[in-house]
């Protein structure tokens, strides 16, 4: 009897999860991974054309959190494809391995402003979203410098 109840409960749980998946060409919330550097990403639309995105990057020299406010727009005749851009900010911490490339710098804190521009696509009929983006940033704390190498490719699972 316990096994039957456990199997029934598991089946109901998986059925509910399947129904919660988004299979349209739009979405409200998505969670996934970003490539270069490696990141966990979550994007949530607060309005049909406005989203908040959080990225937690992990790389050789430390960790960095970036928060972004994105404005999205449709691309005519391309269902599910949107352009986006917006401002943001980051907070990061790097370790002393940074000194291998920058001998005059010690481990420390990284605070700055970011921008983002890119394309976002939601597959109709599947709970999958991909995006490609460029995320230039300017660090203003510790050492002031511009970095144009953030961004890349993201693959997300859409929840709603």
Outline where the language-model segments fall.
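Residues that define the transmembrane beta-barrel architecture of outer-membrane proteins
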Residues: 25-27, 34-38, 61-65, 81, ...
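A structural signal for short, well-ordered beta-strand segments
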Residues: 87, 134-136, 153-155
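Short, hydrophobic/aromatic-rich segments at coil-to-beta transitions
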Residues: 25-32, 48-53
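Cleavable N-terminal export/targeting peptides
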Residues: 1-25
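Short glycine/proline-enriched turns and hinge-like loops at secondary-structure junctions
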Residues: 46, 144-147
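Gram-negative (and chloroplast) outer-membrane scaffold detector with strong preference
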Residues: 44-132
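Outer-membrane beta-barrel porins/channels
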Residues: 22-24, 135, 140-144, 158-160
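Outer-membrane beta-barrel "beta-signal"
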Residues: 148-160
